[in-house]
Structures are given as C-alpha cells and as structure tokens.
Amino acid sequence: MNKIQMVDLQSQYKNIKSEIDNAVIDVIESGQYINGPAVQEFSLNLAKYMSVKHVIPCANGTDALQVALMALELQPGDEVITTDFTFAATVEVIALLNLKPILIDVDLETFNIDCDKLVKAIGPKTKAIVPVHLFGQPADMEKIMQISKEHNLYVIEDNAQAIGAKYQFKSGIKKKVGTIGDIGTTSFFPSKNLGCFGDGGALFTNNDELAIKIRGIVNHGMYKRYHHDVVGVNSRLDSVQAAILLSLIHI
C-alpha cells in the first residue's frame, strides 16, 4: 500500500526535474546570485499573472508582512486589526514593530475575518486591517474595503494561502486577492500554492509611492547604492529561488 501525502514535494520536483535543474544551473553558472536577471524576470511574470503594477520579491512571507507595515510608517502603539485564526507570523510582525495587534474572531462558515466584529473592534488608534485569505478562499474584500474607506484605514492582505484566487465584486469585476488592498503579501514556502525550494516571499501593490518605499526597505533602506535613507532590512529573494519559481509559474 502506498502512502498518499497531502504535500509531496519530492514527486512535484520529479515531474519537472529537468526544467528545474537547468534553471538552477543557469543561475549558478551566471554568478549573479543576488538580484540577478532571474529575480527581475520572475517579478515581471508574477506581476502579469496577478494583474498588478508592482511585485517586490523578498526573503519570506513573514518579512513581506513586516515590510508592508514598515512602508505604511505606522507609529508605536497604533492598532492593527487581524484575525485570531492565522499563522503566528501575521501577528508577530505587528508586535515586533511595537504596534498593538487587535485579534477578532472569524466567520464560522468561511473561517475568514468576521466583518461585523471587525467594525466593532475599530477604535481611535486603529490604523490598519490585515485580512487573511485562508485555505484558498478570499475574505470579504468588498466589505473590508468599504470599512477601510469609511474609517480611513490601510488594508494589507495576507495572501500566503490563496495566491491565484479571485474575488468577485457585486459589480461583476474580478480581481486576484492580494491586489485589492493597499499592499498584498505572500509566501513561497515550499508547501504553499506557489512554493519555491526554500524560503521566499513577495509584496504586491498598485501604488507607485508604496512600491518605491518597499523596494528600499527590503534592501537595507537603500534607494541609491550605499545611500541609506530609512531603516530597512535585508530581505531579498535570491536568484536560485527566483529561477525555480519562474519555472513553476508557467505550469
């Protein structure tokens, strides 16, 4: 009897072994391991797939969430509302930045953030909402965006489990989740919908100003070589992982 695994990474690799091997060898032979052509090409291809203006790759999904909050320039003590049913990373980055996480329960039918409870949780210090699209199912983004507009709040979408999923508005317009709020984030952890062979992540935005901020923050706060204008982090997707993801995105 053969054991059927929920996630079989070895079998996934075997199905596309030659393509992956060639992609990795090309990067190694190029000597361009950080911010090389593979990273730029993957970014452009993912932006096209997501129908979003800017994709900024980073080291992992946790960093993506942290960088998104940093780009919004929230202040210590500001409140960020998110769901209590999510991976720890969603909440830990809020605490790491000396912000206050406000956890609310989920809708029992969708397991996504409960919009009625969300409204009740908004206070004078609330600055942002972080909905989590869980199990490939989008949160109610129409309501969330309406609430954010009424209360002047930022929206950061945690899209680690739903890349590629579409949300349909009442008007009939469809958008990929992760591209609806101010910033979207995702993870390329191996077991994710789109997973690399290590750690990786990305941020999405249609806002040009935020895209510039994010690109600097993920690269030590540099907007010009050796000119560090803001406090940043070292969070770059390496070229090997980008090449692997570039192979996978075409499947």
Kindly give the residue locations of the regions a language model identified.
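Active-site phosphate/pyrophosphate- and oxyanion-stabilizing loops and adjacent acidic/basic residues
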Residues: L44, E142-M145, K174-K175, D199
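Hydrophobic/aromatic ligand-binding patch that stacks against planar heteroaromatic rings
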Residues: E92-I94, I147, K176, N193, ...
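Active-site region of PLP-dependent enzymes
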Residues: Q161-I173, I180-I249
